[in-house]
Swiss-Prot record:
GO molecular function: chorismate synthase activity; FMN binding
Cofactor: FMNH2
Leading EC class: lyase
Gene behind this protein: aroC
Entry GO CC: cytosol
UniProt cross-references to HAMAP family, sorted A to Z: Chorismate_synth
InterPro entries: Chorismate_synth (IPR000453), Chorismate_synth_AroC_sf (IPR035904), Chorismate_synthase_CS (IPR020541)
Annotated PANTHER family: CHORISMATE SYNTHASE
The protein's annotated pathway: Metabolic intermediate biosynthesis; chorismate biosynthesis; chorismate from D-erythrose 4-phosphate and phosphoenolpyruvate: step 7/7
Annotated protein name in UniProt: Chorismate synthase
Amino acid sequence: MLNTFGDTFRVTTWGESHGKALGAVIDGCPSNLPLTENDIQYELNRRRPGYSLFSTPRKEEDEVEILSGIFEGKTTGTPISCIVYNKSQQSKDYTAIKDTPRPGHADLSYQLKYGNYDYRGGGRSSGRTTIGNVIGGAIAKKLIEYTHKIKVIGYTTEIGTIKGDFNYYNNPEFFESDLNIQKLSNQIEDSVLRCPSTNSNEMNEYVFKAIDGKDSVGGVVEVVIYGLPKGIGNPIFNKLEGRLSSAVMSINSIKGFEVGKGFESSRLFGSEMNDEFYFKNGIICPKTNNAGGILGGISTGAPVVIRASIKPTPSISKTQETVNIKTLETVPIKIGGRHDPIIVPRVIPVIESMVSITIADLMISSGFINPSKLSNI
């Protein structure tokens, strides 16, 4: 089982949903980066359960403790180790279904591959393990913003069959200045679904309807990388979009990924899809950004635009059919415990984290960030 992501900026995550604790070890972060537990806690608070209208009732504070790698408020270049203790497990909720793999979950595939599987809350396959992703992502996000003022911002564009009216292509002006991006960030965080669209209330009603029907819903998240320099990524087998898709698709519940116009580009003429170039203050710029900031696997300097589709939460209160792996019989199953009717808004900081880790990794390996130490900026 591979638990480490990255080449030069490496994040190793560990822990299970109902274990004693979870955490991450970050290796390859340069020294001299100002970093506190508050930097990490802010991102963990955005991901944590039990504190929003559509979140699981399982309340966890998810308080992070930095164990190593920081001295006098700055990174030392040594591994940064962080831990978060679980405090609200209810493992008894899973005893009755330990031999009956839950539809839509990784129970069966983990059992078949590893045999000894921690069934409590999904164990290592649980979405709760993304705490480690967010710890690493918080540090990566701080690094790329501190050194190059790069911002990674995600938001909901669709919930179920309801499409929002806000996206990068409808509202490019929001990504033209730091001030506009801050305004957008405030709008996103003020929304229970992290959706800046004017019809987000319609999405809320859609989720309520699913809850009433003992069901769950999914959605689509768009992420924009603002301020990424030209020249990040490599052609052929190490393309920027390939690295980003690998990072995002590693997250539980992600079932689709696209860049720029994505699948819509297959329905356009070349004359509609191509981004023409012009000079702006002596710099070559695209008139449009249908490519999503990437050409030939390399960043163009325009905002990088990606989207990910998130499946409905597999734990639902409806009775379903499964099998008992001990008796070899088909049996009904009804999932108890505490679960999210929708995980889209909580997945957004996880996607931002994996994107930030990828960008930090590439910025270091491409020579944009000194791998040893940062100068006083």
